[in-house]
Amino acid sequence: MIQNVTDDKIQWKCLESKIESQRIHYGRFAIAPLKKGQANTLGITLRRTLLSDLDGICITSVKIDNIKHEYCTLTGVRESIQDILLNLKEIVFKGVCDKTQKGFIFVKGPKKITASDIQIEPCIEILDSNQIIAHLTEPIDFKVELTIEKSMGFRLQNATQISKDSFSIDAIFMPIRNVNYSIHPVEKAGDWKSELLILEIWTNGSITPKEAFHQASEKIMNIFLSLSNSSDNQIQEKSTKNFEEKEEFIFQNIDGFKQDKETKVQESLGWKKISINQLELSARAYNCLKNEKISTLFDLLNYSQEDLLKIKNFGKRSFEQVVNALEKHFDMKLSKDSSKKFYEQLKNLELINNKDIS
């Protein structure tokens, strides 16, 4: 508990900032004084914005000479194609990337290929040039073409190749690795009705936690500024016209509603491609899920919190691991309702049948 806060003006301060590794930067911030309830509202808003609304740069597709599918093997290359794609996925970029960029690797073995071997435009740079991509054990030519993009959030790989000899990969654009917050009571004028918000931010090194904090704050501020810029008179004058425009817009877009639902279904079915390995669970929790035939996030999302606790040998600790991992890696939560809820949501869209989600 923190005592004797007298200033009414909300202030923030960086309590700690350190570089844990080249790809993990940590920052801890304090925001106070806040009225009771404001700290939780602000903490949730900042966390959501940090995890979903900040731009990042990463590789989105890869073209490797003489490779037609990801299960091929290359003579003279120690790693499998899947391993190479995973290594490329982990490379962190920073800089300015207003349009899609191309990167290239042209090397001859034997050689250890690292991120420093990637030829890219000077507007972007690789954070950790020592990241290993592959090992060439024989004197072979190794040629790779990379597509590098800037966006927000993450993008699941396409089910099919983008073009001949080219593969899309799961692109994680978000520069934020994790965000935690905690709320502490503060004494002010003899009572404990004020609160202090502690915010912890881990980034991938492409931006500092302080930069991430500023960017998220600006995005939140811009949202509220857009709401406050219109006066009551302006709102009153436009209300009738806006209603008519919205009514016309709604009826014009009825035909497009089915297409929107199809998009929602495709996004939902994309979770079938993400293995529960990505949750980094303990062996016990992982084996319990596998025994229950839960292999992907899509499978897991069809279980409610209550359903998970009913799984044989699946205790409270394993349950907490799954819940925390879902929130940490994908900012998702399991439903508290029936285990069939996720399936039913897809079925209710009237665009899929049991065959689509089996």
Swiss-Prot record:
Catalytic activity: RNA(n) + a ribonucleoside 5'-triphosphate = RNA(n+1) + diphosphate
One Gene Ontology term from the biological process aspect of the record: DNA-templated transcription
GO terms under cellular component: chloroplast; DNA-directed RNA polymerase complex; mitochondrion
Keyword Plastid: yes
Enzyme superclass (EC): transferase
Primary location recorded for the protein, binned into one broad class: plastid
Record-linked InterPro entries: DNA-dir_RNA_pol_insert, DNA-dir_RNA_pol_RpoA/D/Rpb3, DNA-dir_RpoA, RBP11-like, RNAP_asu_C, RNApol_insert_sf
Ranges for region Alpha N-terminal domain (alpha-NTD): 1-231
Keyword Transport (UniProt): no
The organism's place on the tree of life at top rank: Eukaryota
EC nos: 2.7.7.6
Listed Gene3D superfamilies: 5' to 3' exonuclease, C-terminal subdomain (1.10.150.20), DNA-directed RNA polymerase, insert domain (2.170.120.12), RNA polymerase, RBP11-like subunit (3.30.1360.10)
Localization annotation: Plastid, Chloroplast
GO MF terms held by the record: DNA binding; DNA-directed RNA polymerase activity; protein dimerization activity
Region named Alpha C-terminal domain (alpha-CTD): 266-358
UniProt family annotation: Belongs to the RNA polymerase alpha chain family.
Assembly, per entry: In plastids the minimal PEP RNA polymerase catalytic core is composed of four subunits: alpha, beta, beta', and beta''. When a (nuclear-encoded) sigma factor is associated with the core the holoenzyme is formed, which can initiate transcription.
Protein name: DNA-directed RNA polymerase subunit alpha
Source lineage: Eukaryota, Viridiplantae, Streptophyta, Charophyceae, Charales
Protein's gene: rpoA
